[in-house]
UniProtKB/Swiss-Prot annotation:
This is Putative ankyrin repeat protein L767. The lineage of its organism: Viruses, Varidnaviria, Bamfordvirae, Nucleocytoviricota, Megaviricetes. Keywords: ANK repeat, Repeat. ANK repeats lie at residues 61-97, 228-250, 251-282, 345-374, 517-546.
Length: 632
């Protein structure tokens, strides 16, 4: 293998320590997915620099390898027919290609149909996964000449006439090609009614989402030429296209208004049919009221109410009960317009209003005779904020009930209520937020409590934990925290200076302190990605094997730090593999590729959850209230 010729498609992002993906010359025609991904039109012939003492190589799949040392030779243009011939000559006659669909799409996208002809003549088959989706999609079919080439070579590409028709109508505005396909002798077996239904699908045959809008011009031509069954056509477009519905109705198509009302039409469609002179009967109104999950339900009911189509007689207990759960604002609008209060279950309405924290509706329930005291326990179980509002509306808390539930989530409003009534202390509330939340959510609440502690000259509990955790998870919170006027000890001052990127006197603070071997400090330095501070700590603790082991584990967070410690210290990089991989950020592919090249198993590198609570790193993170399964 070491004497073989390889091709490099693209240089890696990190050129300080490049890790190259190279492809064996005999299989390069199967690698055009990567060529398309990197949007390149050149490839470079390389040799493996296996004489270099640091040389490493790893087989990824097939004849694709990852290596850290190469010698670049000649760069070739993929748009040169001579290059294509060279790649064909390099091919292994016994190898059966698996993914040449990317190869053909690449050259068609470049309008190099001559090269496609050359490949076809060279017996390079069109094969791969999702070949039709690769060819016939909203991205490739913006190119008129590409689509025309596919049509002319449809048998080679494995595209039946239906596939081409669907693609032409669904993705393009190439009307001449649509006409050509319609008039073709092969279209006689197409079920146009089913064809139209398929055109309105939001996903293709392979389940991929279609984002482009359907152009209706060509469909109107098919309508005019009577390609569809009128009844099937009407109900297909009724569900999916106001434009086409309007078009066929104005052409005089027959429709049954009862069926229209029973369909899931939106407000625009409803208005259109009413404006045509169709009369809404009581049965129609009841159907519309009963379909609470239909398109534009609230808008349709509001429209009908505003235009006097709806009266009290149309409502039942069931309809009103559904609206209570579905939309309190709609219910409020109905109550203000109609006398339907007798149909409302006030107990359910009051509880729903408490859960939705809808004060306006709570007030109405009280006006209608609800005793707010009967709902105080229900409110306490849900939220201290809504409980406080009920108290303001005259509610009384029973002696055996405490308004404060320490297990409820905290908001700034609830924090202030708790403090005003001395239900808990600032210190406890802060610890509760820090310890119970996996990430640094509740940023505003944390800053609110810390601001109150500072203004009252109270110490901030677990400040170290707050600083480290915020540094680990989020730029936003620690940028706000370090703006506060904090009363810091020397240890905390080091943390804050690092977070502020004020490095001038940190080295002295560390060197002359008792914290030089602190694992927490090492953790913060790694999070800062400051290599000078990292070097300082390693130099001071160079004889501490355990400290160096922690440094390597933490360095999973930052590749340049990892590379430094590996190159300069004799650390065992395999001893704590799982912990190292826990530290790697989700999108740090450089570190992942490096460790893979160094012999780490892929299953370890991409393990997103750690089930071993006994690991030292997991225990360390738990002490800081950091969830090791949530990666930044």
């Amino acid at each position: 293998m070491m004497s073989q010729t390889f091709f490099l498609i693209s240089d890696p992002d990190n050129l300080d320590y490049p890790i190259y993906t190279v492809h064996d010359k005999s299989r390069i025609l199967d690698c055009f997915c990567d060529i398309s991904l990197f949007k390149t039109t050149t490839i470079t012939e390389i040799e493996l620099d296996n004489e270099h003492p640091d040389f490493k190589i790893l087989k990824l799949y097939g004849n694709t390898f990852m290596t850290n040392r190469i010698i670049k030779n000649t760069k070739y243009s993929l748009l040169d027919v001579n290059t294509v011939q060279m790649l064909l000559d390099y091919g292994d006659p016994d190898y059966e290609f698996k993914s040449t669909h990317y190869l053909y799409v690449f050259y068609m996208s470049q309008n190099r149909f001559d090269i496609c002809d050359y490949l076809i003549a060279s017996n390079i088959k069109f094969v791969g996964t999702y070949t039709k989706s690769c060819l016939l999609n909203q991205n490739t079919l913006t190119n008129y000449h590409l689509f025309k080439y596919i049509i002319n070579n449809s048998e080679f590409f494995g595209c039946c006439h239906y596939d081409l028709m669907y693609a032409a109508f669904r993705y393009t505005k190439f009307y001449d090609l649509c006409d050509h396909l319609i008039k073709s002798e092969y279209n006689c077996n197409i079920d146009y009614d089913n064809f139209l239904r398929q055109l309105f699908n939001k996903t293709d045959s392979n389940g991929f989402t279609i984002n482009c809008e359907l152009d209706t011009f060509q469909i109107k031509k098919l309508i005019d030429e009577n390609y569809f069954d009128n009844e099937k056509l009407f109900y297909t477009v009724l569900y999916d296209s106001f434009e086409l519905t309007k078009y066929i109705v104005e052409k005089g198509f027959y429709y049954d208004f009862d069926s229209v009302i029973n369909s899931d039409i939106n407000l625009e469609m409803l208005k259109f049919f009413i404006e045509l002179g169709n009369n809404l009967t009581d049965d129609h109104i009841m159907i519309l009221l009963s379909k609470k999950y239909s398109n534009d339900y609230c808008k349709k009911i509001t429209f009908l109410l505003d235009n006097n189509y709806i009266t009290e007689k149309h409502f039942t207990n069931k309809i009103v009960s559904d609206i209570v759960w579905f939309d309190l604002n709609l219910l409020d609008y109905l109550i203000n317009k109609l006398n339907i209060i007798e149909l409302i279950n006030l107990d359910i309405l009051m509880k729903t209003s408490i859960l939705r924290e809808n004060i306006n509706m709570i007030k109405k329930c009280i006006e209608y005779g609800i005793n707010v005291d009967d709902y105080m326990k229900f409110a306490v179980d849900y939220s201290i904020c809504i409980t406080k509002k009920l108290i303001e509306l005259g509610g009384n808390i029973p002696d055996d009930i405490c308004i404060y539930n320490p297990y409820h989530s905290l908001s700034i409003e609830s924090i202030d209520i708790i403090l005003e009534n001395n239900y808990d202390s600032l210190e406890n509330l802060l610890l509760k937020i820090i310890n119970q939340n996996k990430e640094t959510l509740y940023i505003d609440e944390i800053l609110h409590i810390m601001g109150k502690l500072i203004s009252t000259n109270k110490p901030i509990p677990d400040l170290n934990k707050i600083l480290i955790k915020s540094c680990y998870y989020s730029d936003n919170i620690y940028k706000e925290i370090i703006k506060l006027d904090l009363n810091l000890d020397n240890y905390q001052q080091i943390f804050v200076n690092i977070m502020r990127k004020e490095y001038d006197n940190i080295e002295q603070l560390i060197f002359f302190s008792t914290y030089y071997n602190s694992i927490e400090l090492l953790f913060v330095v790694v999070l800062s990605e400051n290599i000078d501070l990292f070097k300082l700590l390693l130099e001071i603790n160079c004889n501490d094997t355990d400290y160096l082991s922690w440094a390597f584990v933490f360095s999973g967070r930052c590749f340049k730090l990892m590379k430094y410690i590996v190159d300069n210290y004799n650390v065992d990089i395999y001893q704590r593999q799982i912990e190292v991989c826990i530290m790697i950020p989700k999108k740090d592919y450089q570190t992942k590729r490096y460790l893979q090249l160094m012999g780490y198993e892929i299953s370890c590198i991409y393990n997103t959850e750690c089930n071993n609570d006994k690991l030292p790193l997991v225990e360390f993170m738990k002490e800081l209230s950091i969830d090791s399964t949530i990666r930044p």
